[in-house]
Amino acid sequence: MVMTDPIADYLTRIRNANMVRHESLEVPASRIKKDISEILKREGFIRDYEVIEDDKQGIIRVFLKYGKNNERVISGLKRISKPGLRNYVKANEVPKVLNGLGIAIISTSNGVVTDKEAREKAAGGEVLAYVW
């Protein structure tokens, strides 16, 4: 089966594993998934991730993060720009997610960054996803 939207698949796997409180999950590796994983780790939404090299494309193992009473750190994930309908924003139109409580992941010419970093660098780009 051909995967038409690997980013949506990645976010869905995280959402599903989070809903059933799995400790970790594995996804096929790609550069953009590594960049998204790095942002999620840096912003405190996941505990860690590791890239496992194999003879093919590799695997990313994501370790999910939960609170003291096993409450979820990730409340929601939403794919914004889709293959059939891309969503681009200018530097002055970068969205805020839940008035700053969440993050927007944006693919810019400077790489994949959060909404806050995009505003600081005055860079627009493709809005990949919202995480809150």
Curated annotation (Swiss-Prot):
One of the primary rRNA binding proteins, it binds directly to 16S rRNA central domain where it helps coordinate assembly of the platform of the 30S subunit. GO terms for molecular function: rRNA binding; structural constituent of ribosome. The keyword Glycoprotein does not apply. The keyword RNA-binding applies. Keywords: Ribonucleoprotein, Ribosomal protein, RNA-binding, rRNA-binding. GO terms for biological process: translation. Belongs to the universal ribosomal protein uS8 family. It comes from Latilactobacillus sakei subsp. sakei (strain 23K). One of its GO terms (cellular component) is ribosome. Gene3D superfamilies: 3.30.1370.30, 3.30.1490.10. This is Small ribosomal subunit protein uS8. Part of the 30S ribosomal subunit. Contacts proteins S5 and S12. Coiled coil: none annotated. Disulfide bonds: none annotated.
